[in-house]
């Protein structure tokens, strides 16, 4: 993890619903605990991190302090565009240009324009010299990127616009962003998955897409919510014997209610235990698929509880500190 945290930008992405925000938050906690001024960036109108830390969201475009050395930001493409234009041409002309029908049409209609603007803002956050002199830079920026397909589109937007514009400020800015994304010393990529066939397949496709578009690959794959393998072979055999030895359930008679309840409990418990074992074995088989493809894999234990709260994310951060 030390080498990862030495980069300026870490991109966290993967299949939808696998826990990308959870993992990005956990890495943010870990980096902050190590004294790095850290920012976790959300996109696509997401602003969930303040709530995790018991705070009210400040709205898109506001860098919010979550705790010592840790901030969050939900990128607002319109605000980012205004900041960029003001940096290029001054406050007044920037506002005029941003409000012009030409630029509004460009950002609304040009495919990938909002993605490019978001990536430009993320690039700016990694710089020691920010667009506004009073803004302070960060040691590490964590991008909680969209799911795989949208993330790849977002990451390739600088190259697309550089090819379209060729010269001028858009081409120059796109080149700077692309250089960051392709620099292994400054930028790293983490895939997040779960132990399912679809998530593993999408992780493989993500790695291939990064290599194709950016000549980069995944530094590691973090497999979230992995169930423990609790039972030995002998214990599984004993569970099978217990399940097979319980007679078929019938309606209890007045004199057999206690035995009926005991048999019912035994059957339910053994079936549940065997189902959990089968699920865990399936997950570990999927993790083995990733390892056979030479990915560095880190498994995150399933967090049991009514909800995934800050203590659970802290436990994940502690686990990552030991494994990466």
Segments predicted by a language model, with ranges:
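NTP-binding/hydrolysis catalytic cores, primarily Walker-type P-loop NTPases
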Residues: 293-324
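N-terminal phosphate/diphosphate-binding loop that engages ATP/GTP or pyrophosphate donors
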Residues: 29-99
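Conserved catalytic-core segment of NTP-binding enzymes
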Residues: 2, 18, 22-26, 33-34, ...
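ATP-hydrolysis module of ASCE/P-loop NTPase motor domains
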Residues: 83, 89-126
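The Walker A (P-loop) glycine that initiates the GxxxxGKT/S ATP-binding motif of P-loop NTPases
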Residues: 14
């Amino acid at each position: 993890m030390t080498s990862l945290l030495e980069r300026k930008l870490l991109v966290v992405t993967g299949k939808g619903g696998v826990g990308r925000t959870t993992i990005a938050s956990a890495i943010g906690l870990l980096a902050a605990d190590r004294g790095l001024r850290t920012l976790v960036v959300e996109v696509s109108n997401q602003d969930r991190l303040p709530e995790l830390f018991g705070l009210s969201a400040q709205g898109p475009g506001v860098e919010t302090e979550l705790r010592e050395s840790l901030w969050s930001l939900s990128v607002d493409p319109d605000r980012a565009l205004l900041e960029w234009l003001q940096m290029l041409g001054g406050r007044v002309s920037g506002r005029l240009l941003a409000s012009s029908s030409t630029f509004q049409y460009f950002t609304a209609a040009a495919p990938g324009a909002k993605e490019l603007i978001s990536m430009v803002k993320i690039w700016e956050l990694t710089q020691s010299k920010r667009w506004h002199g009073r803004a302070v830079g960060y040691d590490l920026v964590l991008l909680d990127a969209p799911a795989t397909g949208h993330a790849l589109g977002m990451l390739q937007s600088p190259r697309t616009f550089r090819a379209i514009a060729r010269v001028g400020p858009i081409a120059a800015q796109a080149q700077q962003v692309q250089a960051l994304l392709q620099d292994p010393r400054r930028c790293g990529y983490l895939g997040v998955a779960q132990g399912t066939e679809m998530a593993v397949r999408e992780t493989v496709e993500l790695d291939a897409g990064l290599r194709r578009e950016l000549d980069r690959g995944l530094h590691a794959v973090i497999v979230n919510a992995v169930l423990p393998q609790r039972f030995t072979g002998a214990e599984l055999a004993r569970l099978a014997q217990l399940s097979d030895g319980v007679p078929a359930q019938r309606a209890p008679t007045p004199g057999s209610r206690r035995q009926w309840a005991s048999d019912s409990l035994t059957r339910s418990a053994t079936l549940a235990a065997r189902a959990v074992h089968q699920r865990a074995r399936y997950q570990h088989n999927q993790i083995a698929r990733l390892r056979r493809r030479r990915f560095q894999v880190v498994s995150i234990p399933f967090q049991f509880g009514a909800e995934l709260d800050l203590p659970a994310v802290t436990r994940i951060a502690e686990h990552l500190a030991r494994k990466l």
